[in-house]
């Protein structure tokens, strides 16, 4: 995937921001969300499983 970007700079030429096209932004956002979900799943993979009814009761508390 090639990323086309433009930079926003201040009067001294320091980069202050980046402009991405919308499709690129959405793809990056999707990848980050997928990565976050993966990390959350890895954190709990060794925890004890509970059934649906128990989970519902815990959420109601």
Curated annotation (Swiss-Prot):
**Top-level taxon of origin:** Archaea
Keywords linked to the UniProt accession:
Toxin-antitoxin system
Pfam families tied to this protein: RelB-like (PF18506)
Task: Please describe what this protein does.
Answer: Antitoxin component of a type II toxin-antitoxin (TA) system. Its cognate toxin is RelE2 (Potential).
Q: What is this protein called?
A: Putative antitoxin RelB2
State the organism named in the record: Methanocaldococcus jannaschii (strain ATCC 43067 / DSM 2661 / JAL-1 / JCM 10045 / NBRC 100440) (Methanococcus jannaschii)
